Each structure stands twice: as C-alpha cells, then as structure tokens.
C-alpha cells in the first residue's frame, strides 16, 4: 500500500529548494499548505498569482489550483508541507495534471495574496486573540482557508511557562512549533519540541502542551471534516 500518512487523513513532509530551482506548474486534487521554516527569496505562483514565501509564512495551495514555486535567493529554503493525500487516496478522487506550457505565465505579483499568511500577520493576530477561558489552548486563531474544507489551520500563542488543560477529541492534529520550545504530552508520550519540529496527535488521544519559551504553535486538523460529518466529540480532563 501507499503507507505515507502522518495521520489517517493527513500527510506531512519536509522540503528543501535550492537557489535557482523551480517546480513546473501542476495541479492535483489534494489540498495543500506550506509552513515556511527558513526562506529568503523563494516564491509560489498559484493560479497565475506570484507571492513571496518568507520565513514564518503559511502558504496555501487549494486543490486543483495551478501552482508552482521557485527560488530567487542565494541560500537553501526549507518548509513543511501538509496535505490531505491519505483522505484523497481513501475516497479515490485522485487526479494530477501538468500544465501544458511547463511554467504557467505570471499574471500578477501580489505580496498580499489570499493564499499567504505572513509571519507578521500571524504574530499580530495571535497577540490580539482572546485567551481560552477553559484553558485547553493558548491564544488561538483559525486561519481562513474556505477553499480547503478538509484541513483546518490554527496558530496559537503560548507564553513561557504556560501549560494547557488536557483534552481529547475525535480529530487528527499535526503540530509544528513556528517559534519557541516546550514539551507536549500526546497519549502516554512526552514529546519535547522546538522550532521546525513536527509531531502528531491521532484522534482521541489526550493532548496537553507546556511552553518553555514564548511559543507560536501551528496546527492542521481534520476537525471540521469531522464536524461536517457529525462525528466530532470533545472531552476535557477532569
């Protein structure tokens, strides 16, 4: 089988692009995103719109959008890819197409693309976010990705020394710290983490986080797919 899944519905992988490299324009059924770990000068082109991919950005590639990427900088760039490929394999609407021109023409350059959440925006939005009154999460914001209904995207801010209240729910979640360090407990496993790491909380495992440093924690989840199907359950620890 195609045993690549990070969770039942989600897959993640790290990617490096070297200066001068380009990926030809293509499209596929799965929805995708990138969390940019280290980059100066790389870019993405989605449906003819070119925008930067800089350190700390989150970049979207909704299913069946023409897209490619390249790198005009002078140092390697690194990011974390996240897709719903396992779900697409299960349901079987897997399609892929290369652009007939190889590299599609850039129709416009837009640093403020709706497919890009900048690091500056993420910092500002999490600073303004309200605290979770139940204590399960940090100051958390859901990023808008209406064209990608199978993947929910969150960023949350945890202060140094902050611990969250333990919970479990019927959704898969992949976490990646964008800033800071800490330890999370998933099920019975204690997982130390730092910037650029990735760890997964499969469905119905207890989850809690402890931040050692001020932290911005990215997560992607199938929670909203579960809500749509009326499968979603949430339980807080006593």
Predicted regions and their residues:
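A short, N-terminal "cap"/entry segment at the start of jelly-roll beta-barrel domains
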Residues: 1-8, 94-154, 233-238
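Conserved short histidine dyad/triad with adjacent acidic residue
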Residues: 1-2, 10-28, 153-169
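Exposed loop/turn and edge beta-strand positions of beta-sandwich/beta-sheet ligand-binding modules
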Residues: 11, 73, 152, 171, ...
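Conserved hydrophobic/aromatic beta-strand scaffold that supports enzyme active sites
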Residues: 12-16, 33, 50-52, 58-60, ...
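A short beta-strand-loop-beta hairpin characteristic of the jelly-roll/cupin
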Residues: 18, 22-55, 65, 168-195
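Conserved metal-binding segment of the jelly-roll/cupin
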Residues: 19, 46, 52-73, 79-84, ...
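Double-stranded beta-helix
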Residues: 72-121, 212-238
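C-terminal functional regions that serve as terminal interaction/effector modules
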Residues: 149, 156, 160, 164-165, ...
């Amino acid at each position: 089988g195609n045993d690549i899944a990070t969770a039942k519905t989600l897959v993640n992988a790290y990617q490096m692009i070297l200066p001068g490299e380009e990926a030809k324009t293509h499209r596929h059924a799965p929805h995708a995103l990138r969390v940019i770990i280290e980059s100066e000068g790389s870019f993405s082109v989605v449906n003819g719109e070119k925008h930067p991919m800089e350190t700390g950005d989150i970049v979207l590639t909704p299913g069946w959008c023409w897209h490619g990427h390249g790198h005009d900088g002078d140092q390697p760039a690194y990011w974390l890819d996240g897709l719903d490929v396992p779900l697409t394999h299960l349901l079987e609407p897997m399609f892929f197409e290369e652009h007939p021109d190889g590299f599609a023409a850039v129709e416009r350059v837009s640093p403020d693309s709706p497919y890009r959440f900048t690091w500056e925006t993420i910092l500002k939005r999490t600073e303004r976010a309200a605290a979770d009154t139940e204590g399960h999460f940090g100051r958390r914001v859901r990023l808008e990705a209406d064209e990608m209904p199978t993947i929910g995207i969150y960023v949350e801010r945890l202060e140094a020394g902050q611990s969250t209240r333990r919970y479990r729910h019927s959704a898969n979640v992949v976490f990646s710290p964008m800033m800071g360090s800490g330890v999370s407990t998933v099920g019975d496993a204690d997982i130390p983490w730092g910037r650029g790491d990735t760890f997964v909380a499969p469905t119905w495992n207890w989850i809690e986080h402890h931040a050692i440093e001020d932290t911005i924690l990215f997560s992607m989840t199938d929670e909203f797919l579960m809500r749509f199907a009326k499968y979603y359950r949430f339980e807080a620890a006593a």
